[in-house]
């Protein structure tokens, strides 16, 4: 708005990448609350767009997608899409979820207090909660979870590269795989 006011004035709709795919597949202008939680425009606790944040950001509600829970059906394939893909037009399109919320569901991190830590390009700690909560130290973000509950999440960049640093600088080895072998054994047989 400040740097490119002409472009800001032309914004008709605001979508996240997965939501654009849902739009192209079904024609539904929508998002899910887990992904919308990271847009700074969502009242996470109440799972609705925040009037206060829309006013601060000068965004109108009609520019924002309709909100769904992650598992909710948002539509079916448009006939021309179904024909092009060779699918039935009855194929349902669901709202989906943000990447970390979807990963948490996939790893079973859905119970109250369960924690998931992932290391990759970023490092993420994800704590599921049946109730909305706010970290008073502002170290963790409050989000809607894909299973209808909430979660606290913290992220940092370059997380997996920390493993390399740890192995080389602290453990004085370049064989990170050998260093991790005893840890891997702890996870065998569902232990």
Question: Regions from the language model: what does each represent?
Answer:
Residues 32-36:
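Nucleotide/phosphate-binding loop and acidic/charged catalytic motifs
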């Amino acid at each position: 708005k400040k740097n490119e006011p002409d472009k800001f004035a032309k914004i008709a709709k605001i979508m996240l990448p997965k939501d654009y795919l849902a739009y192209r597949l079904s024609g539904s202008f929508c998002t899910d609350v887990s992904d919308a939680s990271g847009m700074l425009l969502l009242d996470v606790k109440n799972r609705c767009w925040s009037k206060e944040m829309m006013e601060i950001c000068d965004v109108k509600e009609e520019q924002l997608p309709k909100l769904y829970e992650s598992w909710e059906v948002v539509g079916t394939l448009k006939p021309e899409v179904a024909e092009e893909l060779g699918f039935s037009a009855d194929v349902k399109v669901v709202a989906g979820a943000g990447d970390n919320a979807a990963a948490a569901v996939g790893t079973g991190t859905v119970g109250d207090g369960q924690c998931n830590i992932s290391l990759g390009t970023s490092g993420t700690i994800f704590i599921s909660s049946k109730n909305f909560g706010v970290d008073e130290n502002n170290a963790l973000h409050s989000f809607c979870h894909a299973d209808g509950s909430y979660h606290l999440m913290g992220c940092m960049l370059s997380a997996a590269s920390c493993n390399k640093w740890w192995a080389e600088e602290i453990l004085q080895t370049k064989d990170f795989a050998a260093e991790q072998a005893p840890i891997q054994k702890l996870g065998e047989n569902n232990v």
